[in-house]
């Protein structure tokens, strides 16, 4: 049965709350996959000879064996903190920017071309990522620390607060934004793929009578957006992860140097390291997020995304 089309304009505060809550649920459910992706992307980082290939299941088995099941959630707290800033800014930013374009062109939002939606989504993602980059840095560092623990070494940080403090002390305020360039490049590509594709695909599915505005339409749209955003963003994600994991003794001078060295020492395929776990995370993450967000909006009496 088609959901009722509620048209009440939602207060910005309500939309921020719903987006944050949906993101927290999605992040908690899919975080072990994100950890697997990060460990795979760091595998072979800085090695001139490359390293033997290791698959997603091998990484998960190694983490569970050496760090226990709790090791699969290493870095969850900064990840949730990040999403309290990142997701509301990009989601509400996308809706508001799209609304401005619609009002200026006296058009309706569903008729906007995909290219326009893609640019709006990318720009919203850039703004959100600049704000959330310090929390993203801490998340990556804490996820990478698990490798030290598995080798019997002491981790660099005991928690997110200590991580923030140590980074500030040793690398300065600018250190919190280390890797921000590949970070925003990835954010632009991810949100260009996710927001625009989800928005466009959902309305296409509904308009073509493939499904009504329900969980089936949301699932189809989230699968398509997950594939699009993963394909576009994976190379930038690899570079971002390696740049952000660097401490004071940097292996890479900048994101371009990281890109060149990765291809030189590990081959072009290394730019898509972690593609499967990235997609395996983005797919479920987007499914959980969008289904939750659409449901929360419906319960709050707000029109669908």
UniProtKB/Swiss-Prot annotation:
GO terms for molecular function: transmembrane transporter activity. InterPro entries: Mit_carrier (IPR002067), Mito_Metabolite_Transporter (IPR050391), Mitochondrial_sb/sol_carrier (IPR018108), Mt_carrier_dom_sf (IPR023395). Gene3D superfamilies: Mitochondrial carrier domain. It is found in: Mitochondrion inner membrane. GO terms for cellular component: mitochondrial inner membrane. PROSITE patterns: SOLCAR (PS50920). Keywords: Membrane, Mitochondrion, Mitochondrion inner membrane, Repeat, Stress response, Transmembrane, Transmembrane helix, Transport. It comes from the Eukaryota. It is a multi-pass membrane protein. Induction: By high light. The chain crosses the membrane at residues 16-36, 69-89, 118-138, 178-198, 219-239, 272-292. Solcar repeats lie at residues 14-100, 112-204, 213-299. PUMPS are mitochondrial transporter proteins that create proton leaks across the inner mitochondrial membrane, thus uncoupling oxidative phosphorylation. This leads to a decrease in the efficiency of oxidative phosphorylation and an increase in heat production. May be involved in protecting plant cells against oxidative stress damage. Belongs to the mitochondrial carrier (TC 2.A.29) family. This is Mitochondrial uncoupling protein 3. It comes from Arabidopsis thaliana.
